[in-house]
Amino acid sequence: MYDDEDEMVNDPMDGDYIDDSDEISAEAWQEACWVVISAYFDEKGLVRQQLDSFDEFVQMNVQRIVEDSPPVELQSENQHLGTDMENPAKFSLKFNQIYLSKPTHWEKDGAPMPMMPNEARLRNLTYASPLYVDITKVVTRDDSATEKVYDKVFVGKVPVMLRSSYCMLSNMTDRDLTELNECPLDPGGYFVINGSEKVLIAQEKMATNTVYVFSMKDGKYAFKTECRSCLENSSRPTSTMWVNMLARGGGGGKKTAMGQRIIGILPYIKQEIPIMIVFRALGFVSDRDILGHIIYDFNDPEMMEMVKPSLDEAFVIQEQNVALNFIGARGAKPGVTREQRIKYAREILQKELLPHVGVSEHCETKKAFFIGYMVHRLLLAALGRRELDDRDHIGNKRLDLAGPLLAFLFRSLFRNLLKEMRMTAQKYINKNDDFALDVCVKTSTITRGLTYSLATGNWGDQKKAHQSRAGVSQVLNRLTYTATLSHLRRANSPIGREGKLAKPRQLHNTQWGMVCPAETPEGQAVGLVKNLALMAYISVGSLPEPILEFLEEWSMENLEEVSPSAIADATKIFVNGAWVGIHREPDQLMTTLKKLRRQMDIIVSEVSMVRDIRDREIRIYTDAGRVCRPLLIVENQKLALKKRHIDQLKEAADEANKYTWSDLVGGGVVELIDSMEEETSMIAMMPEDLRSGGYCDTHTHCEIHPAMILGVCASIIPFPDHNQSPRNTYQSAMGKQAMGVYTTNFHVRMDTLAHVLYYPQKPLVTTRSMEYLRFNELPAGINAIVAILSYSGYNQEDSVIMNNSAIDRGLFRSVFYRSYRDNEANLDNANEELIEKPTREKCSGMRHSLYDKLDEDGIISPGMRVSGDDVIIGKTVALPDIDDDLDASGKKYPKRDASTFLRSSETGIVDQVMLSLNSDGNKFVKIRMRSVRLPQIGDKFASRHGQKGTMGIMYRQEDMPFTAEGLTPDIIINPHAVPSRMTIGHLIECLQGKLSANKGEIGDATPFNDTVNVQKISGLLCEYGYHLRGNEVMYNGHTGKKLTTQIFFGPTYYQRLKHMVDDKIHSRARGPIQMMNRQPMEGRARDGGLRFGEMERDCQISHGATQFLRERLFEVSDPYHVYVCNNCGLIVVANLRTNSFECKACRNKTQVSAVRIPYACKLLFQELMSMSIAPRLMVKPRQSKRSKHQSEA
């Protein structure tokens, strides 16, 4: 049945003979688009971009890196004798096929065990798979070669991304996952490194191999063309070439009369080279020849005029060798012969200049054409015929995901491995003329390198940590399920956070549908940290070879065979930035290319093809990191998506050979479009726009649903299109801090911190996108009954009044888990660690805490109630036997206490204790403590519209206002919270929620949905006998009198946020002080003081409150006594026991004064003295009161 239908889809005559009954009506569209979206998420999920990228890395990149590495070639060098050996043995090692097995853990006894992710989390292991490679060893002795193949040599471990195809959990059913203690809803897409979950954040960068023209505001250059060229999957760093046009009068000197010259900046060459000299160095000598490569049409006087100054400048140099010498002299180190300089210049032109065009011999023509194209673009921009490029256009950006990031790392680590291998093998060869392979492969290089970067987030070599990028790998946010999803779809721009540039932070038009417009952090990173929109996908990259072969067949003319004059009328073709040829029939070519892509034949669906008709260019991109999104294909103003597709998707839920998203892509119904191609498409917002008589009759695509422009966090907001935009941004940040159920297996996990809400509810008012975020299964909030009124004044300034009785029934009650961990580290035999119960007889340094809560094995037992500073894990460290380790009492202790204590500010119950062995085979404990958190005054709550507030007071139900029906609100918020913030969505949500509660079905609040509006909701509410705008008559709870106004009243979804008073309350009278300056410590965790800062000081000075000032800044901070010599004013040596003083500077022992200054001041004086600056304290003799009176008299 399906086969003939598929043929119908692919039939080009499609639109003509199928009758209109198969079209989707406007009413059915509301459902149809969600069927398509569901098909997308069923197949792709929300973290597909991470998983695909990692799979690409393992399946393709690793193999490519290993194969591309040159063989290790060695020969025995005679060490001591001066004579050379006649024919030393030659050795060569070549790497072939690689293998990655399932994640494995080797126990200390050496037995390999398959490892599950949860075991890795609990035991602080790294979830990694061993990597094996086949090595061929060729030994040549006396002209006879012997070859030996070593199968599957272990070279290191590669961390595995959860749920990728190499993970144990891939393709498991929910039942299997549950048996493994994994959450079936967990999306994967992260790594487990030493027991902690790490995400790789996508890194934004400018696209390589593309020509950009920028104008320079006020510099030496008027325009600058750059091409950052980089060979696909090679280890070479990018080499950038610039072609710049000097500003008028720029470049100084007498040449200004000549006009604007064009110069090139080549890699490894210190000075700028006139562009004509570069052409001559490439072997194009005559002026006409060069101009042909730059200006394709000689009948263009303006452009000819622009290049004239450059021709005049290079007039002196006419042959290729002179030009090469000119370039070589400006790069090579001085004092080399002319031949060497020419050779050096040739080498640079071949290998370093524009490597993506070619690095082999005889690429001169291609390179000349490409440089000519760069100059041509520069001239077009200078003449104002083509607009400048936009740095912030998302099509000019690439996102590096796990794949490219890990490939970059693996490439350098593998190179190091080869280096170490060569050195070790050379040693063995010199000693005994042969070597064993397994001794030379240092497996820890790759293992440690990958683990280090993923664990710390410093992306690059450990030794050069300061140059590497920081924060590439982050600990996965596990506060709420939403926070987890959002973290896995984040992208980061590596621009300094300090820069005040507004441009890169602004929302760019091209980000529509690719980047969420609401979800970005507030503060310094605003706009630099982005989140992907729901249906955005990032290309993993494919090989350009099939496309190049196809173009060859389809009459593309190669640059080597083209005469420059032919280029003017033809269309240039670029593949991944490299100019590969020209074509005479661009229209036909594009149609064929698109058709092939829609049939997924030769061309992969994620390849993008752009035809720039005005500039006569066709650009084809197959590289990784382009952001793209699916759109519905429109042909002849009709959707390619028909009713039958929808029916097939609907009924496919249970069949084995079901109709899926891939079939839609393969059937030419939807396609992936990146933002470059989007610019050349005409996209309808809704299928209604395709009706005839619209403002456009050449639509090429149609949006699936406009709500898909939002990201994970913004998709939870009901009616976001009725809120002021910053409010949606605030909610996107707060939704990540709401409490809920963050994963269904939280009881078997040992997370450092975890909050779980007691009775989470799914919202009464939902958006359609929520079902893909699993918000209904793992919600983070409660439908509270909310009244908006000012009642008693305890809800001013964004505070809320809560119903105490509702809290007693469990409203917003949550449980808080915190884990503590410790292990016996065996550093060396001298100080051996033991987990045991410390005793006061044997241990020094024991605190005044309760050690008796510990069991005999030194670990507290589950169910114990613990409070601040109690011991949870007893641990002792053996002290080495030295005699000077005596205590003040003169007692010698064999051990020192190293126990773990509960945080001083917390109380709770020991929930779970886990004993295990860690990766080193040492004993290892994790203890989870739980405490119940009731909502209390000062805790933070928020609705889903950025309306956050703290609890101001709790009233019993009797004191709350009530409606005529006898309903009392759970929460009362202040009316002043709404008007100035314009969160109308909040009010509509309340109205819709009221209707839903009456109607008994979930309300729809999907954005950009015109079918739901206030008029309709109000009309339906009226039918249930309520006021049409949701107002109700209420009675004062204290007096029973009717309130004079009607109150807006109904259910609203509220979230409890993680900021709780119990975690913040802090005060200090006396406490610990810092070693260095003897001032109080900082921070609540260290029982620190509250800083009386510069601004506070300035206020007290302006008050003139000197005694208070002295007390704060001196008496209660760091008072100190110093003794000062009266003669020279320097600090003297004082011995208070014998009461003897001596000034070392002037040998004075009697004239000494005691001075009280802050200890920090004393420290400053001594630091100044160490720099040979003498701060002298000049002291006056203190007058007695009597002498004072006499002097006044």
UniProtKB/Swiss-Prot annotation:
Q: Name one Pfam family in it.
A: RNA_pol_Rpb2_4
Q: Which GO terms describe its molecular function?
A: DNA binding; DNA-directed RNA polymerase activity; ribonucleoside binding; zinc ion binding
Q: What else is known?
A: The binding of ribonucleoside triphosphate to the RNA polymerase II transcribing complex probably involves a two-step mechanism. The initial binding seems to occur at the entry (E) site and involves a magnesium ion coordinated by three conserved aspartate residues of the two largest RNA Pol II subunits.
Name the residues that bind Mg(2+): 798
Principal localization reads nucleus
Can you state which reaction this protein catalyses? RNA(n) + a ribonucleoside 5'-triphosphate = RNA(n+1) + diphosphate
Its BP terms in the Gene Ontology are: DNA-templated transcription
Q: Does the keyword Nucleotidyltransferase apply?
A: yes
Q: What is this protein called?
A: DNA-directed RNA polymerase II subunit RPB2
The keyword Cell wall biogenesis/degradation is annotated on this UniProt entry: no
Job description of the protein:
DNA-dependent RNA polymerase catalyzes the transcription of DNA into RNA using the four ribonucleoside triphosphates as substrates. Second largest component of RNA polymerase II which synthesizes mRNA precursors and many functional non-coding RNAs. Proposed to contribute to the polymerase catalytic activity and forms the polymerase active center together with the largest subunit. Pol II is the central component of the basal RNA polymerase II transcription machinery. It is composed of mobile elements that move relative to each other.
- Keywords noted in UniProt: DNA-directed RNA polymerase, Magnesium, Metal-binding, Nucleotidyltransferase, Nucleus, Transcription, Transferase, Zinc, Zinc-finger
